[in-house]
């Protein structure tokens, strides 16, 4: 839906109370947490993300690069395309590459973050049913795309997707959850169901994964001189 009332939910970074709450939480629990939020920057609005390190420090922002538009997903009405470029955040536990939702459908995003030194990729997500086609269930397609990123880049991928139903007027979207963690071979290690809130975890040895990636040589054998054509289409 498109309604100007929702612009009132946007917050400013880093002055909102939200960041103080999660900063204290991360510091207390010795954990790293990416937080996505609706950002207001002067008269511009973004779908943004900040990573809070285990000491409570806030990273610089990432602003969602790819803004979709479709029935039930009217994001171009609310969000300006991001101006930060793809980001890799150095944390206590490793280098975290973060995209937001629709970013996950673009292999350029995953490859750029991996080349920039990411140890693991994370995509906070809100994807579900398609109002224009009630019979379409894109859950497997959605997972397959990110499993492909994991396998092609030899890097673990985490996708955190919401649950529940949102309805505005005659348009309804039911989000299908199914958050998952895939390993560097593209295999799903653990997955949530479609309806329940919760969390799952998996340990990775980033040093061993880096050695595995190097042993394959597909980053060594890249030909960036041949890829410039992509930017011309």
Question: Language-model features: where?
Answer:
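C-terminal beta-strand edge segments of enzyme domains
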Residues: 152, 160-233
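Active-site catalytic loop in hydrolytic enzyme cores
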Residues: 11-13, 20, 24, 40-148, ...
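Catalytic phosphate-donor-binding core of small-molecule kinases
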Residues: 141-148, 152-156, 162-163
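Short, Asp-centered acidic motifs that coordinate Mg2+ and/or phosphate
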Residues: 32, 120, 156
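A charged helix-plus-loop insertion that forms the helical arch/lid used to bind
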Residues: 1-15
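Short beta->alpha transition motifs characteristic of CBS
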Residues: 1, 50, 61-68, 180, ...
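Generic beta-sheet signal
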Residues: 36, 123-124, 160
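Helix C-cap/helix->beta junction micro-motif
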Residues: 28-29, 116, 153
